[in-house]
Amino acid sequence: MGIDPETFPVHSIPGLTVGTGLKMALIAVGCGILSILFCILLKTVGQLYAKYLKNPYIRIAVAAGVIILITICLNTKDYMGAGSGLIARAIEKGEARPLDFLWKMLLTALTMRAGYRGGEIVPAFSIGATFGCVAGGILGFSPELAAAASMVALFCGVTNCPITAMLISFELFGFSGAAYYLIAISISYAVSGYYSLYKDQTIVYSKYKARYINRKTR
């Protein structure tokens, strides 16, 4: 139909060395931890809503007021919507504010668990991309590459889908940074443990041993 797929060319890709590999691994550990925090935040906000705002209409109205107030205080609409603008800026320009990923996490949880419809996947992408961009800048690593790798690493951490994350990275970013994407995805997958966005997801085999566990995610 003549529709081109979305791609984000990553131009600043350093050669893989022990130093760059370790920096990528450190960022990936951060993505795994952030994956856990995101899952816990979503669950906790949902529980608080259910406890203190049992009426769904009041809950939605109160949540809307809180979200609008936070947006006015922050003086930006960057955290509204799925977060595609944050993703593009982080990967294409290597730009992200230090707290972008935290505000996006909070506002996503407040919105989704209040009852507004949408998905967590693209917001998870934007959280990962902005975190990676900031972490890359701190570590003296390519912010663009760190944003791309962290985007799929955090996605893997919250969904427990490493193969899907790998294929998404190749489709969106190409194969030039494949080694970094694989490092980030594998480490985030291990660090994130058995947390997930999906409460009914089942992990059949242990992430750490060749053992059948057949357990539900947290």
Regions found by a protein language model. Give the residues of each.
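Alpha-helical transmembrane segments and immediately membrane-proximal extracytoplasmic
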Residues: M1-R218
